[in-house]
Amino acid sequence: DGFEVLNVMERKHLIEDIPVIMISSEDSDVYVRRAYELGVSDYISRPFDAKVVYQRVFNTIKLYAKQRRLSTLIGDQIYEKEKNNRMMITILSHIVEFRNGESGMHVLHINRLTEKILECLVQKTDRYHLSYSDRYLITTASALHDIGKIGIDDKILNKPGKLTKDEFEIIKTHTLIGARMLEDMEVYKNEPLVKMAYQICRWHHERYDGKGYPDGLKGDDIPISAQVVALADVYDALVSDRVYKKAYSHEKAMEMILAGECGTFNPLLLECLVDIQDTLQE
């Protein structure tokens, strides 16, 4: 019957996009109320006037057309805002990379790696309850992971040789510098993107066994956003040329990460890295 059709449409989320007008000889309040609860746009009881029905159908279609145009307009505006956000984040992160003597590809690589790892993770488990919006925010905010390096002395940042213990302690402060920069943005600090970027900036050098920095967080006390970006950052650092080292091959980088030479990572994320490794060299 009509209610069964409405139930099917609701289960398949069709009722949100297709206007439904129900015509029935039933006119009890319970019957009509149930129809509206299931998502009908209008309810017409028999007997009816054909001209009135025509006008109500016409008005319903006209209303849905307006709603669709409005949704498209809002969608376009949101897209433009997100595009501008991404552009400004990319520009800012490239400034940091330029100062760090890098090519600018690191941010792009981190972005793509983060996206791929997250895609794999949500297929493996719902443990972290990551929505599409969450994954988008993490991927976008990943570009700002090293923004704190803008506060580190060039001589240390671009030193070709091994860092001294004191120099390494200074380098480690880039996590706190980046987090503080974002925290100091009073107007925007509660924006979801800024809050996500804060997590990543501060904790992308933490390790799953608690031996990372700056706070020595352990396991899932480390936000999953920072865990994912940490793994992406380590892999890309290994396979890229740096002022202090030559690039390792993909095979060697994977061997080092899986052997724990770069710290301990979430086993689920390591599984994801292995699963997507065929696409990594692209």
Describe these PLM feature segments.
Residues 14, 26-30:
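Negatively charged, flexible loop motifs adjacent to catalytic sites
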Residues 3-16:
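Short amphipathic alpha-helix used as the core "switch/output" element in two-component signaling
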Residues 3, 86, 97-282:
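Metal-dependent catalytic cores of enzymes that make or break cyclic nucleotides
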Residues 30, 47-57:
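C-terminal output helix
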